[in-house]
Design a protein with these regions (language model features):
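C-terminal anion-handling pockets and recognition modules
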Residues: 66-70, 190-245
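Mobile genetic element proteins and their domesticated derivatives, centered on retroelements
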Residues: 2, 19, 74, 110-111, ...
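RNase H-like DDE/DDD metal-dependent nuclease/strand-transfer catalytic core used by mobile genetic elements
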Residues: 81, 130-178
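Short, solvent-exposed loop/turn segments at secondary-structure junctions
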Residues: 26-29, 75-79, 114-117, 155-158, ...
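RNase H-like polynucleotidyl transferase catalytic core
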Residues: 94-101, 168-188, 205
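Extended, low-complexity cationic-aromatic segments
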Residues: 10, 48-138, 237-244
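Conserved short alpha-helical interface segments
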Residues: 1-41, 69, 76-78
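RNase H-like two-metal-ion nuclease catalytic core shared by retroviral integrases
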Residues: 39, 153-154, 161, 177-199, ...
């Protein structure tokens, strides 16, 4: 791409090898890009700051008063066709990973508790929508008698009319708070999905959908057992509490 840009702009064709050396000498390195949080305008930044410094302490205090689960929720789809990442290989030999080519994913709803690291999850083959989200939350409510404070993002079906009706019907035990827009970094369960992808999905071959499903369910069960691996995912909030103290 850089070679083509130079050719188009300056009419000079450099070899790829020379360009690599030139870029290294200029202080560049070949890196994998990462996603950055969007919405960095002043208004969005102020809403994020207010949520972290004002709203979050109130949510935490409410959960402590009620002895409630403080659950951060999110959903994810793990693709059968697999995913790629960096890995070590001999120079000149690009590694390859088999793929089924099947454009199908195993979906998972998840909630993790701030205080205990408890992990609630439900895998499904259906679509992620209001109906399946309500079924998951109903299952969670049935599994405990404790009050629940739910922190969720702004996915459209999280705030649909069906969900609003569901939340109202369970208001005695279930309190819902919305994360600010453009704030995946405020949702610790995103890190859990990343860990599962890194350990169990990247560079793996899933010839059948059941192979994927079994692999994902084993990973989910592992985190459900090992709460000590879930609790560190909340380090961002614990550090922010220390700064605000």
């Amino acid at each position: 791409m850089i070679q083509e840009l130079i050719r188009e702009r300056f009419g000079v064709l450099y070899s790829v090898k020379y360009l690599s050396e030139l870029l290294k000498n200029m202080g560049f390195s070949y890196q994998k890009a990462r996603f950055a949080v969007g919405g960095d305008d002043p208004e969005t930044a102020e809403k994020r700051r207010h949520w972290l410094e004002v709203t979050w302490p109130r949510i935490l205090a409410q959960a402590q008063r009620q002895n409630a689960y403080l659950l951060f929720g999110h959903e994810v789809s793990f693709p059968q066709w697999g995913s790629l990442t960096y890995t070590w290989a001999k120079r000149g030999e690009q590694p390859t990973v088999k793929t089924s080519g099947k454009r199908k994913g195993y979906k998972v709803f998840g909630l993790i508790d701030y205080f205990t690291g408890r992990f609630f999850h439900k895998g499904l083959e259906e679509r992620l929508n209001s109906k399946t989200y309500i079924a998951f939350l109903t299952q969670v409510l049935a599994s405990t008698r404790k009050p629940i404070i739910l922190v969720q993002d702004g996915a459209p079906y999280h705030t649909s009319k069906a969900l609003q009706k569901f939340f109202a019907a369970h208001a005695r035990r279930l309190t819902v708070h919305q994360l600010p827009a453009y704030s995946p970094d405020y949702n610790p369960i995103e890190k859990l999905w990343k860990k599962i992808k890194e350990r169990d999905i990247h560079l793996h071959y899933f010839p059948t959908f059941d192979d994927l499903k079994v692999k994902v369910e084993k990973a989910l069960s592992r985190f459900a057992r090992l709460r000590k691996e879930v609790l560190p995912l909340f380090s961002f909030f614990r550090e922010s509490e220390m700064k605000l103290a």
